[in-house]
């Protein structure tokens, strides 16, 4: 599943075109740049996280503690995590996918064979049609529909309701997933990537502007690290996979959901939740690439994408390094496993978890908010080897949860990585926080954890400016915009040709007239001189 928007802010610089016509040099310079629209965010009073952890979330009508927001999201491996919302008057209950990689709030508004219910806007007395068509393509799937507004409530926030922009999905392609149990998507990104444009206020902006809820939320998604009491992670021959449980804290943090110190990465920009990756290690060995390679053309934290996605060169490097670690223990891993096209189904394992022992940990280093420092996310094999079940052969299998990015989508820290951590989206202070999740603690107690549990290190010094690792989009190349720029330049040139021809004709005519005039004068002077020479000399 990959519901990150294929959006890239591009600044295209078209080189000057020099065209010479009849020794006249014409230079046409065209620059094309995408427009940036900004919707001001509501900014509350400055507070430290110590003040928000475990405190009540204040709204216009009720007080809700973050303690009451535990286990309010559910998910299924590979199909995303969702939260229950009430929409309209009277309320209609729907489940929506939690997606930090997009910014539109959209729900099904017509029947579909992959969903059990949908939003009936004609039955809501508070629905308002905005008369705007919206279409959102993702790197996987797309949907289109009509933009409107209605009252929305999040069940775990009590009876608090607010007016939100809602896209009523009337058509979709490869968007709704069988057995996913969600009927819409909750985009939690910034206004800049909202569709059709940034004038559409995103869900979380509406929530914080209409209530006194602080501009922060956090996600704990347990996934592969939950105990067997909380989930049955692989599909079974007896039925579909069970759901996993997690928590979404809105307006504050729950200290009981993480261990140790929270480490923060600064937001590079407010569109996606973009951070900067400074290095990747397999086991103890760095991939050794220029750090700009890791962030080509961005690195984002995206709950709506299942896998860890990496730029092609980085994907090839990390895959080769993992192969080198595992080949001596598991020489028969099919090549299609590494590309995600096939499952790995061990036949001689004494335990369905044994392959975890032969795969290395991965370490993702991120820029820290502490100047001149970075911190590490240590990723367990349990996270990037997703358990799956082969119904045909009735085997426990594994799927490689690292994939190459497509269409310059950049690096995506998806759900399989986030599942090891308590992840904080501190919009008010423009940073993303990571701490070790309490989810692994459950499986440690029951003895079901295998391999290295996810870890997070303290911030450490680096001898370079991490900001230099960010990809410079100001020199990015977009063929479509470049072609448009050249077409406009050609139109300008066509318009200039008549002016140039007229100017040249005028100059030529002027010079020709001047030459004819000088020719008459010279001829007259020669005639006079000739007459003078032929006259008789009157001197004695």
Swiss-Prot record:
Q: What is its main location?
A: membrane
| Its EC number(s) | 3.4.23.-
* Peptidase A1 domain residues: 81-435
Q: Where is the active site?
A: 99, 302
One GO location term (cellular component): plasma membrane
Question: Where located?
Answer: Membrane
Cytoplasmic side of membrane: 504-540
UniProt-listed Gene3D superfamilies = Acid Proteases
One GO-annotated biological process of the protein: membrane protein ectodomain proteolysis
Ranges annotated as spanning the membrane: 483-503
* Group of enzyme by EC: hydrolase
Q: According to the UniProt entry, where is the signal peptide?
A: 1-31
Protein's membrane topology: Single-pass type I membrane protein
This chain belongs to the protein called Beta-secretase
Organism of origin: Strongylocentrotus purpuratus (Purple sea urchin)
Q: What is the lineage of its organism?
A: Eukaryota, Metazoa, Echinodermata, Eleutherozoa, Echinozoa
């Amino acid at each position: 599943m990959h519901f990150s928007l294929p959006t890239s802010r591009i600044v295209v610089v078209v080189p000057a075109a020099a065209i010479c016509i009849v020794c006249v040099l014409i230079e046409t310079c065209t620059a094309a740049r995408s427009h940036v629209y900004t919707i001001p965010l509501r900014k509350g009073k400055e507070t430290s996280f110590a003040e928000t952890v475990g405190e009540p979330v204040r709204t216009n009508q009720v007080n809700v503690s973050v303690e009451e927001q535990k286990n309010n999201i559910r998910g299924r491996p590979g199909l995303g995590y969702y939260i229950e919302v009430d929409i309209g008057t009277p309320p209609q209950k729907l489940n929506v996918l939690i997606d930090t990689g997009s910014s539109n709030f959209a729900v099904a508004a017509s029947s579909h064979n992959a969903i059990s219910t949908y939003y009936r806007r004609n039955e809501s007395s508070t629905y308002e049609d905005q008369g705007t068509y919206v279409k959102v393509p993702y790197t996987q799937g797309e949907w289109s529909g009509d933009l409107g507004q209605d009252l929305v409530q999040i069940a775990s926030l009590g009876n608090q309701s607010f007016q939100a922009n809602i896209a009523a999905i009337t058509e979709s392609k490869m968007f709704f997933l069988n057995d996913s149990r969600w009927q819409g998507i909750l985009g939690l990104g910034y206004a800049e990537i909202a569709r059709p444009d940034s004038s559409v206020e995103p869900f979380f902006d509406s929530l914080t502007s209409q209530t006194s809820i602080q501009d922060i939320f956090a996600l704990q998604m347990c996934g592969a690290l939950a105990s067997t009491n909380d989930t049955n992670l692989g599909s079974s021959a007896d039925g579909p996979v069970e759901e996993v449980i997690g928590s979404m804290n809105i307006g504050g943090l729950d200290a009981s959901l993480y261990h140790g110190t929270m480490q923060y990465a600064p937001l590079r920009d407010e569109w996606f939740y973009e951070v900067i990756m400074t290095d990747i290690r397999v086991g103890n060995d760095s991939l050794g690439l220029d750090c700009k390679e890791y962030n080509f053309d961005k690195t984002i934290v995206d709950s709506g994408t299942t896998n860890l996605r990496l730029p092609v060169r980085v994907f090839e490097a990390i895959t080769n390094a993992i192969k080198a670690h595992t080949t001596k223990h598991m020489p028969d891993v099919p090549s299609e496993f590494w590309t995600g096209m096939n499952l790995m189904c061990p036949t001689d394992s004494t335990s369905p978890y044994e392959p975890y022992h032969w795969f290395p940990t991965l370490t993702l280093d991120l820029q820290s908010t502490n100047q001149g420092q970075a911190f590490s996310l240590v990723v367990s094999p349990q996270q990037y080897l997703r358990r799956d079940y082969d119904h045909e052969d009735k085997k426990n299998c594994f799927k490689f949860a690292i994939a190459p990015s497509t269409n310059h989508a950049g690096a995506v820290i998806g759900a399989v990585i986030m599942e090891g951590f308590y992840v904080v989206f501190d919009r008010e202070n423009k940073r993303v926080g990571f701490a070790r999740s309490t989810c692994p603690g459950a499986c440690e107690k029951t003895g079901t954890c295998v391999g290295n549990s996810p870890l997070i290190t303290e911030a450490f010094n680096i001898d370079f400016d991490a900001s230099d690792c960010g990809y410079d989009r100001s020199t990015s190349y977009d063929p479509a915009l470049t072609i448009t720029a050249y077409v406009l330049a050609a139109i300008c040139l066509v318009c200039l040709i008549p002016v140039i021809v007229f100017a040249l004709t005028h100059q030529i005519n002027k010079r020709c007239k001047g030459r004819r005039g000088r020719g008459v004068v010279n001829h007259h002077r020669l005639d006079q001189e000739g007459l003078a020479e032929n006259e008789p000399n009157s001197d004695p």
